[in-house]
Amino acid sequence: MKILVTGGAGFIGSAVVRHIINNTQDSVVNVDKLTYAGNRESLADVSDSERYVFEHADICDAPAMARIFAQHQPDAVMHLAAESHVDRSITGPAAFIETNIVGTYVLLEAARNYWSALDSDKKNSFRFHHISTDEVYGDLPHPDEVNNTEELPLFTETTAYAPSSPYSASKASSDHLVRAWKRTYGLPTIVTNCSNNYGPYHFPEKLIPLVILNALEGKALPIYGKGDQIRDWLYVEDHARALYTVVTEGKAGETYNIGGHNEKKNIDVVLTICDLLDEIVPKEKSYREQITYVADRPGHDRRYAIDAEKIGRALGWKPQETFESGIRKTVEWYLSNTKWVDNVKSGAYQSWIEQNYEGRQ
């Protein structure tokens, strides 16, 4: 099987590519624009494989997408290419509209034109797998807002869409496009919506890698608001396994939610990281003393939590990592891969960090 992966140099995309090349006999065509968050060093251990090809291209480039489909003749598409950071979407939404909505449209059309010319067997087996986020659902009631006797709700595959940020609105739009191409044109699509990912090779603008690296450098550990926002944390390699299971075994037209069963307050995640660093690389004072509370993000969702029962029941997937095992692996990875970290932390990254956090003190 040959799988066209978009965004395969990004955080989740590179985990998917590594999983496919290292654990299956399938081939990968990796299409990536190589924005600030795309890093080919994350694919160093698979880049020499005969089953791996890299295409430096923008999914918004229709002629390039048509050429790639015609040249490589994929059996499936896993569409992960996206702008994904909420803070960046607030200060610069245009890139999110262009990549996440227009780019998905261009890719859908390229896939549809290619798929329509396939023979019947290949048509039936072809899949267009669109990888999305639980943020399209908005947020859920927080424990502080409900009676303690009430069972807290979870996002399911039938939860209504209510995106809160430019990022989640752009992903919701792309989800709707993908489902429309299934209903209107018959393109065999699948959508997955995941909870917050963490793990190795994560670009250090997101909470967990930012906290690890700031802690090690003696910098402040910025916490939005009171830090009581709750997220369901999914180890990225568990997610990669789930995505491969969906593209190879999932049913066209279906949606599958993918979660880690690990609801944690942001402040508790940060405290856990500090305690691990105190254990592994102790210093005179606890890393907890570097925690600093900053102004909250505009429209910050208070709680996300995924009901992943469907994918477990239908496809037999479940996460292998607990949060405790996964976060330890993550901290140890960053401690052991300082060269990768140094290479991704460019001047542009430093400027963005200063712009985003200094104004929130």
Curated annotation (Swiss-Prot):
Any one GO CC term of the record: cytosol
Protein residues bound to NAD(+): 11-12, 32-35, 58-59, 80-84, 99, 167-171, 197
Catalysed reaction, written as an equation: dTDP-alpha-D-glucose = dTDP-4-dehydro-6-deoxy-alpha-D-glucose + H2O
Enzyme Commission number, as recorded: 4.2.1.46
Gene Ontology terms for molecular function: dTDP-glucose 4,6-dehydratase activity; identical protein binding; NAD binding
Pathway info: Carbohydrate biosynthesis; dTDP-L-rhamnose biosynthesis; Bacterial outer membrane biogenesis; LPS O-antigen biosynthesis
Cofactor(s) needed by this chain: NAD(+)
Family recorded in the similarity comment: Belongs to the NAD(P)-dependent epimerase/dehydratase family. dTDP-glucose dehydratase subfamily.
Protein name in UniProt: dTDP-glucose 4,6-dehydratase 1
The organism of origin for this protein: Escherichia coli (strain K12)
